[in-house]
């Protein structure tokens, strides 16, 4: 009640007697009744008919709290009642009776919202506005809704229910049976009476409105409204401004057309309404699910598209970038392909050669089981390492650094040679010198020979330590003789191998052995740069219950400090703490220093590369790329391991310069057969391709043979022997080829054919004709054509040609066209003129010679 002097009028429906009406005038307390209200001139009154005496067929919808009152009558709000917020009738659901709302200052009942189409003059496309009339209300023009109708003249019905008055209104063209006054229709059907009320804005020609519906004033406006499908504005005296008279409808044809234009989709929409990006970045291979995620699409949509392209895939299948680009192109998305392998490579830091200094040698102790390897290391370190080992046999790789009178030496204690080979198979080369321990009382054992083979395959110098010379059965001379038969000739006997006779238990000859190691290191001139970021190799890694992932790292170059971010294999981390081989905390580790490092987010493999990084974020990115690279099946390349050689791909390795010799491992049923095959194959070596038998022996093909072949990039030949399923599975995993034979000459013939394919074929050149350039014709868009006279032989279009001028070969290539006059020909013989166009060459000169020749390729044979 904003205006204190304003009169609130409420239209109330009365009884069936149309002549009896009650006027309800409510004024605020304190107003002078004799003084006219300034807000109403002439005075406005709201006339309502009294409630009908009988209930209508359809039950009214009373509001809560109105019990005991007429369902149509609404009491005027009191002065202390809070003002109700006006709600848009356009927001109400179509087909459902709207709730009564207070739409005018005086309060009153609201009627159903108009169903008329949009009014074009109205700037608001959502909210409908009820008509506010300034003139007196019309008593003879009530319109009902769902059975609620007035009893007076011209009541309008809905759904076939007609009021008892004169001229009841029907539904959808059905007109009331009254005598003609006030029949109301539906959807454009108007009653002929006075003041009929319709539905959706279509009303009879009499001036009278129902509820909040606008109403055309003249018949011309009615026709215009009907033809346009929209309501019109009403102009009244005293009003210069046009008012909107239409509520908004969301189901009309015009509205549908409007919304299609207004909200037309212009983008391809993916999951959750997110648009497909214009460009994405992919690796060479990508999972279907990952592609869908990058394109904001559902995986099912991507799979469906690929099926239409003829590919049966699942969400976990991997497709190449070319296929992904074709699919993305259908969505208007461009694909940028990046190399995943390049993302896994750490850019090498530039070194200053002046910063390089001598570094300690890294020594690996190898030999047969129980020949005294760990005891020797224990004696050197003067500590009790053996007591911590299970049963006195080494169970893990240990790395230790000892200080001697002449300098530091780093020792690797391996369980036999398996770990040594495993690290080499992963591309790691950590050892500078191998110390081969042989028991003086036991002699050369099979594992000793395998250790020799591994060391030679790694191209690492070997020092021999003949242990247990204090025992009565010791025979060092016999050991030296046996080893000389396997290529380890002693310096005392004119060879190049240094021998040391020692007793690890009695500490005999240890100093001489250490002196030999340092002497060999001086010859090798081992250097490193301690001023750069650390670079090394994982020696071993484990999961410690108290410290998490712990890795033993051999620093090969640079210096590692606490807090440095790093990448270890496919994992990343930051150095949380470092320990030396005695378990003491240290702050930094220099070249050739073995350190235990904590702070890794995983357990890397032995032999994995270790690189300190400048930025932790970069370390994580490289780690993620390596994990992705490993996931899609390229783990070998991610850790630096190259592809393995087979008899079928040897030629490719030769062309790439990656293979200069063919390495073979021979296993036979008896040692005599193995030696015979070895001698036969070694005779196939040529200056271009050498055949190297790195190991031969009797017995079945075992896991160690596979690991040696993997580390050496060699083939395995089995003669009358087989590998068990476990070994076969390991060979497949490592990419090692195993060939089986039963006849010796089959072995020799197949290897011979493979090596002949590696030989560079012999090429024989035959000149078939020459021609002299007499004239040059310049043709636009084609190039220069040489007018020639064939002097000897013939010029063939398919032949190779060379252009010779002043005795110098100017160009070699192929003919692009050969013509006689204007005709294309295949050859031109001596004595005839011809036109020659050379592919990729236009610098012809008169007097130059064009020579045609053929090349014959002859396959070479091994002699």
Curated annotation (Swiss-Prot):
One GO cellular component term: cytoplasm
Keyword set, alphabetical order: Cytoplasm, GTP-binding, Initiation factor, Nucleotide-binding, Protein biosynthesis
Biased composition range(s): Gly residues: 141-211
G5 as annotated region, ranges: 503-505
Region listing for G2, in residue ranges: 392-396
UniProt: GTP binding residues: 367-374, 413-417, 467-470
Region (Disordered): 1-251
tr-type G domain span: 358-527
Region span, G1: 367-374
GO biological process: translational initiation
SUPFAM superfamilies referenced in this protein's UniProt entry, alphabetically: Initiation factor IF2/eIF5b, domain 3, P-loop containing nucleoside triphosphate hydrolases, Translation proteins
UniProt keyword Protein biosynthesis present: yes
A GO molecular-function annotation: GTPase activity
Entry-linked PANTHER family: TR-TYPE G DOMAIN-CONTAINING PROTEIN (PTHR43381:SF5), TRANSLATION INITIATION FACTOR IF-2-RELATED (PTHR43381)
UniProt protein name: Translation initiation factor IF-2
Species name: Leptospira interrogans serogroup Icterohaemorrhagiae serovar Lai (strain 56601)
């Amino acid at each position: 009640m904003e205006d204190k002097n304003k009169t609130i009028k409420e239209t109330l429906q009365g009884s069936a007697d149309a002549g009896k009406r009650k006027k309800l005038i409510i004024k605020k307390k304190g107003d002078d009744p004799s003084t006219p209200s300034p807000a109403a001139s002439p005075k406005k009154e709201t006339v309502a008919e009294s409630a009908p005496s009988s209930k209508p067929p359809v039950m009214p919808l009373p509001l809560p709290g109105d019990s005991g009152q007429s369902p149509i009558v609404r009491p005027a709000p009191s002065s202390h009642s809070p003002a109700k917020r006006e709600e848009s009738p356009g927001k109400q659901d179509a087909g459902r009776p709207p709730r009564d709302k207070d739409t005018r200052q005086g309060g009153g009942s609201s009627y159903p919202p108009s169903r008329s189409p949009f009014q074009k003059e109205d700037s608001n496309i959502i909210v409908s506005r009820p008509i506010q009339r300034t003139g007196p209300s019309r008593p003879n023009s009530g319109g009902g809704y769902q059975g609620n109708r007035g009893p007076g003249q011209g009541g309008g019905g809905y759904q076939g229910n007609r009021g008892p008055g004169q001229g009841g209104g029907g539904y959808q063209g059905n007109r009331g049976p009254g005598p003609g006054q006030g029949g109301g229709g539906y959807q454009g059907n108007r009653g002929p009476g006075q003041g009929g009320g319709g539905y959706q804005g279509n009303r009879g020609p009499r001036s009278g409105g129902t509820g909040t519906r606008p109403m055309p004033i003249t018949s011309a406006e009615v026709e215009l409204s009907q033809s346009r499908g929209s309501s019109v504005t009403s102009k009244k005296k005293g009003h210069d401004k046009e008012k909107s008279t239409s509520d908004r409808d969301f189901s009309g044809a015009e509205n549908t057309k409007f919304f299609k234009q207004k909200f037309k989709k212009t983008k391809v929409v993916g999951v959750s309404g997110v648009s497909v990006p214009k460009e994405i970045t992919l690796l060479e291979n990508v999972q279907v699910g990952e592609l869908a995620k990058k394109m904001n699409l559902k995986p099912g949509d991507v799979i469906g598209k690929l099926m239409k392209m003829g590919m049966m895939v699942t969400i976990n299948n991997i497709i190449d970038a070319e296929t992904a680009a074709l699919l993305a192109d259908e969505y208007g998305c461009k694909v940028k392909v990046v190399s995943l392998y390049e993302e896994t490579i750490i850019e090498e830091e530039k070194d200053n050669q002046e910063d390089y200094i001598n570094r300690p040698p890294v020594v690996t102790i190898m030999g047969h089981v129980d020949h005294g390897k760990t005891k020797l290391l224990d004696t050197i370190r003067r500590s009790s390492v053996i007591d911590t080992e299970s049963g006195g046999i080494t169970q893990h790789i240990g790395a230790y650094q000892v200080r001697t009178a002449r300098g530091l030496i780093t020792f690797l204690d391996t369980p036999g040679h398996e770990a040594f080979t495993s690290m080499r198979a992963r591309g790691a080369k950590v050892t500078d010198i191998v110390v081969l321990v042989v028991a003086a009382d036991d002699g050369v054992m099979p594992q000793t020979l395998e250790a020799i083979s591994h060391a030679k395959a790694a191209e690492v110098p070997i020092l021999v330590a003949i242990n247990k010379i204090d025992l009565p059965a010791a025979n060092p001379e016999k050991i030296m003789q046996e080893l000389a038969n396997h290529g380890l000739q002693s310096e005392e006997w004119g060879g190049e191998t240094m021998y040391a006779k020692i007793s690890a238990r009695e500490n005999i000859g240890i100093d001489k052995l250490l002196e030999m190691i340092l002497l060999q290191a001086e010859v090798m001139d081992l250097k490193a740069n301690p001023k750069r970021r650390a670079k090394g190799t994982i020696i071993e890694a484990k999961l410690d219950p108290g410290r998490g992932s712990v890795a033993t790292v051999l620093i090969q170059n640079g210096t590692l400090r606490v807090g440095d971010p790093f990448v270890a294999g496919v994992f990343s981390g930051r150095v949380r703490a470092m320990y030396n081989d005695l378990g003491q905390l240290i702050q930094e580790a220099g070249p050739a220093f073995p350190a235990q490092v904590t702070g890794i987010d995983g357990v890397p493999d032995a032999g994995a590369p270790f690189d300190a990084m400048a930025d932790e974020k970069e370390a994580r990115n490289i780690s993620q790329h390596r994990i992705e690279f490993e996931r899609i099946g390229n783990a070998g390349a991610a850790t630096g391991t190259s592809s393995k050689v087979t008899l079928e791909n040897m030629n490719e390795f030769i062309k790439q310069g990656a293979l200069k010799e063919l390495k073979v491992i021979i296993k036979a049923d008896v040692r005599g057969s193995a030696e015979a095959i070895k001698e036969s194959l070694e005779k196939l070596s040529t200056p271009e391709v050498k055949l190297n038998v790195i190991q031969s022996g009797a017995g079945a093909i075992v896991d160690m043979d596979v690991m040696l072949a993997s580390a050496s990039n060699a083939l395995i030949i089995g003669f009358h022997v087989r590998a068990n399923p476990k070994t076969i599975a390991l060979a497949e995993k490592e990419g090692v080829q195993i060939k089986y034979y039963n006849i010796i000459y089959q072995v020799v013939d197949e290897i011979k054919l493979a090596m002949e394919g590696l030989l560079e074929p012999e090429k024989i050149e035959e000149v078939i004709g020459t021609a002299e350039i007499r004239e040059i014709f310049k043709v636009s868009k084609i190039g220069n054509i040489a007018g020639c006279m064939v002097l000897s032989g013939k010029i063939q279009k398919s032949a190779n040609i060379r252009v010779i001028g002043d005795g110098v070969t100017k160009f070699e290539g192929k003919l692009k066209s050969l013509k006689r006059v204007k005709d294309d020909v295949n050859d031109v013989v001596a004595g005839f003129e011809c036109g020659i166009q050379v592919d990729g060459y236009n610098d012809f000169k008169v007097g130059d010679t064009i020579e045609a020749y053929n090349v014959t390729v002859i396959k070479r044979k091994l002699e």
